[in-house]
Structures are given as C-alpha cells and as structure tokens.
Amino acid sequence: VCWLLDPILFPGLRRTEIVEPVFVIGHGRSGTTHLHDLLYRDQERFSCFMMWELFWPSLLPKKLIRGFGRLDARWFGGLFERRARARSDARYSKTRDAHHQAADYPEEDDGILTYSCASGSWSLRVPDLSIVSVHYLDEWPERRRRRLMRFYRECIRRQLYLNGPEKTHLSKNPTFTGRVESLIEYFPDARFVLPYRNPLETIPSLLALMRGFWTLRGVDEETMQRGFAQLYEQSIHSYTYPEDVLARHQDILVSRIDYRSLVTRPRATVEKLYADFGYEVAPSLRAVLEEAETRVGHHETKHQYSLESYGLSETQIRERLAPLFARFGWASSPDEDSATTPSFG
C-alpha cells in the first residue's frame, strides 16, 4: 500500500531521474567495503542506503521515521536514537571484525531485495546456493529478472528523492558481479568500480567467513562442503564475468582498483577513481582521504586461511584465472604482493 501511495503523496518522485549511478562490484573480501566507506563520505555527491532503510522499500515509511527522528532530537534529546543505536550495537558488534554493520551505517543495497529472494544474505541462510541462485541473476528467466530489476530501479529512485535528486546513487555489492548485464540494461549510463585482490587471499577468506556463519546455524560438514564447491565456482565467475560483459559495452566507464594500492595509498587510489569518472575531489572528501592516509598500516589481518582445508590448491586457481594473474602480477605470498602495487587504467 505504501509503495502505491508514494507517487501520489510525493509527485516529484515521477520526475526523479537516476543519472550515472556508480556500482562498486568485485569478489567478496577484495576491498569493496573499504572503498565504499571512503566514497560515501562524499555526501555532497553520493546517495546510498543506510542499513535501516533497506527494511523499507517504500518512501513513505522512511519519511515518517526520519520525521520522528527530528522530533526525537528536538523534544527528547535523542533518547530513542540512543536506544536504537544501543540495540544495533548489541546485535552487530560480534561480527564487525569481518564486516562492519550498524543500523545507521551504509550497507549493501541488495538488502532491499531480501524479500524477493535476490539478496546475497540468502547465502548465509541457505548453504545450497542452487536453491536461490542469487548470484547468477543475468541467467534468471526473463520475466522474473525484469520484474526484479524494475523493482530495484524504483527503490533507487525513491532513495534519490529522499536524499536529493541531484545526487549520484552509490551502490556496493559483491553479488552484483553476476548481474552486470542487467545493471547495464536498466542503468545504461552506469559506471562501474572493480576492485581486484589476489584470489589466493579472497577465496579462502570468503569460504572461512561462510563457514563461520553456517556453523552458527548448525549446518553439517557435508552440506558445507557442497556449499564451498558452489562458492568456489561462483568466485571464479565473479572474477571473469564482469570483464566479459564490459568488453561488450565499450562505452561504459569503468575504474579498476588494485587492492594493494587501496590499502597502502588510499588517497591516490580514490583520486584515480575520481579522475576516471571526471569527478572533482571536494575539500570535505580530501580531508577524509588525508585521515585515511594516517591509518595506513595500522590494521593488519590476524587471519590465515588454507586453500587445502577447502579442497582447493593454488595451481587450480592460477589455471582458472591465468589472465588475471598475468595482468596483476599476483604472488603466492600476501607479503610478496604487498611489496608490489602496480597501477593501471
């Protein structure tokens, strides 16, 4: 009902255009979140979804909740906001080491598709990825795919109306590596950011993350192993499919980011991205990037992952992704990788 009321209560919604949206896509654990965290701070330019907003596809509830937030700040000194934030911290604090989450923090906007069974979060609930097949959306039956993409486009339109129609939608979703063709079809002036990280690091890291989630849900080892095999094939697809699609669409602007550069030179990396898209770096964002430079090297991962524990080997990954290994010069050791940070267009 609220969805149908939106264009009636907010006539300007029909005139809101989605212009040159930016999609940050890439294999999970490849720096998509870190990059998105930097970009969304350019709030004069970008619009994105906060986590709590993903529960409300319609514009009307968001308007009401934001209005209540202003009343809370004015009349109750932010009492209800503090309580909501405390509940959010209690719920998500245990998993923030793997992925930062909070109700008032930007989140992967495929969450708006959860009730349509098209969000990557379903892989946490259903280890047999063939049941929901959220990754391979470009291969869905045409009618179902088009219905979902129309819905997603209208969700973005509502969010832009809410945050400012003049802004650019910013999306970060690793699962979108399997729906690049659909994104170009429904957003023909879209721009893509592709972070790349050594798959010898990202693949076992992703599998370890999923093992943690599935263990909490009581999934048995045999079912997990089947899920790992499906995730491995999905991982290979995540590295190869976007480039295959973009090669057919030479007019689409793409910025490719090397993870090693992102973590060692965040300012130069974001400046390169902005140059690729013809953006100017605002003073407020420049200050954010300067702060990011001061934190370089302060966070070192404590995790070590083994390919063998998932029935994989370095040789088979190198064979499947040989062109990318040649292009990026990825080493066998993460320490060796960190010593070389090539830049490219």
Regions found by a protein language model. Give the residues of each.
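PAPS-dependent sulfotransferases, especially Golgi type II membrane carbohydrate sulfotransferases
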Residues: 1, 13, 132-150, 160-163, ...
